[in-house]
């Protein structure tokens, strides 16, 4: 539709103007011609700026007015070219495009403004419940983003990053800008919003990470540049993550940046001093004093005074600033730790409650089958101290002896098989960002064990216990506002434990024991390398841990007087252990490692 020479046409919401690749323009207003769009329009233009084919184009003072609002479906570019000079009867007039996109409007294209000596083109855009998929760097005169409106910066590999330039003012009323950024350090490539005038209101920012692995920033990645008054605010629409880091949207001066750095808190403001209201002085009546004889004091030696040495000023330390670690790191750590420790046992975890008295012979015996049920709670912090993790776990293990024998009639050998099921749930919270993450581990184990007692009758003297398990797990990490991540882990755990039981004394009903012991456990359950939905590569960075335990246990074997002649016995105990690990549970997210601390 071409219009010119001071002509005017009104298009209501039932009309649709269309053009195709063989025509240069969809809507074209020139020479002070005006097209008024009441209620929106559907315009398709297969061409683009490169071949001067536009969905809407105005030149030499032409105008397209869609300010009344409506549903626009625009596939193509916009172009406002210059102005028409004033004449003896008409004023100078800019070429103008005004659109108020509402009601799920959709525009896919770019916006271009050119200038001539007579003036500059004008493209004014207001969006409410509308989407603009920007296909190339664009220029607008002004932009208002109301609620439900989205501007999506486009990006194609190998193509330049896009810039949206606003020649005058930007106003945010709850709309959203979606940038593409390589989330790394300050030098990262990114799309940008450049406002040559002022900003006002509030808008949201979302970021598509284009291959960034996360890095420590100093100033940050500049995404919004404001030349005028920067009164508008921008806040992130959701989490912005890359690698091990969370990024924030922060203002520095007039501009806005993406930063993984926690900025230093501002200096406290000192209140302005308040001048008290002046008070007129009171002039008392003069009083004649009574005469007093003068006193002639004798000489007085002053007491010596120690010189005052001023305290040196203590320099004020600069405020502490930190990088923001993602809480998902804590969930990966908790999952890896659980996978290596859920099925770890000591001898008496398996056999401590399996002794019984044969009712026919009165002999103490050991059952060939055993079952272990354990619930546990664990807490830890990560290496940065920012992430606090709590986990709850449940373990069920079943086992039984396959063979028992004695080599000398006094000792006893046991060989058996065991299997287990375990589940662990954990939750990590960041003390800096407040974001949280949840983890889950569910898995099984199968293996063999062997035990030797030097004295099977009363278990005095030396014992040696060993076991080996194959373990496999399904793991989940569910970060706040992130996709659920699933991965597997598997590997071997094995143990050798030895101890010696001393009988310290006994009386009618009780015997008193001391048992020093040592245990070495090999832990090598490894998680599969995993790439998150956001592109972060996660790797279990723990290379086979050897845990050593040295301890001593003091216990009593006995029964109450009311249980004389019965098989009920109790075994209260106190145990102290020293534990050492050759490796710390560690996870690497892209190039950043984090580990598990106490």
PLM region descriptions:
Residues 45-47, 59, 63-198, 202, ...:
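Extracellular beta-solenoid/beta-roll
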Residues 310-508:
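Outer membrane beta-barrel translocator domains of Type V secretion systems
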Residues 447, 524, 537-598:
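Outer membrane beta-barrel transmembrane domains
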